[in-house]
Amino acid sequence: MVRLVITYDIRKDKIRNKLFRLLERYGAWKQYSVFELEINPVHKVELFHSIADLIEDTDRVRIYDLCERCQGKITELGEVSPDKMQVVI
């Protein structure tokens, strides 16, 4: 498995929403325009192609591949991540 952090800056709402839904299928929404994913290498390649097909030249997507050692050094400060919020009905 590979752990990725993906950030994006997408101008058009329609494309940004599509990218959000795509990334949501693969991982956890952490902050506005930031996702963490843990996927296998085959899905990683598929995801990269899907992102490239979706975005426009003016859009930006950054992908950080986290090594095992780096994963243990993640620090979270402030509000709880959206994926850790609990919904009470």
UniProtKB/Swiss-Prot annotation:
This protein's record includes keyword 4Fe-4S: no
GO biological process terms held by the UniProt record: defense response to virus; maintenance of CRISPR repeat elements
Top EC group: hydrolase
TM regions (residue ranges): none
Key words of the record: Antiviral defense, Endonuclease, Hydrolase, Magnesium, Metal-binding, Nuclease
SUPFAM superfamilies for the chain: TTP0101/SSO1404-like (SSF143430)
EC number(s) recorded for this UniProt protein: 3.1.-.-
GO molecular function, one term: metal ion binding
Cofactor(s) needed by this chain: Mg(2+)
Keyword Magnesium: yes
Sequence positions that bind Mg(2+): D9
Intrachain S-S bonds: none
Subunit (UniProt): Homodimer, forms a heterotetramer with a Cas1 homodimer.
Recorded family membership: Belongs to the CRISPR-associated endoribonuclease Cas2 protein family.
Function: CRISPR (clustered regularly interspaced short palindromic repeat), is an adaptive immune system that provides protection against mobile genetic elements (viruses, transposable elements and conjugative plasmids). CRISPR clusters contain sequences complementary to antecedent mobile elements and target invading nucleic acids. CRISPR clusters are transcribed and processed into CRISPR RNA (crRNA). Functions as a ssRNA-specific endoribonuclease. Involved in the integration of spacer DNA into the CRISPR cassette.
Protein name per Swiss-Prot or TrEMBL: CRISPR-associated endoribonuclease Cas2 2
Gene name of this polypeptide: cas2-2
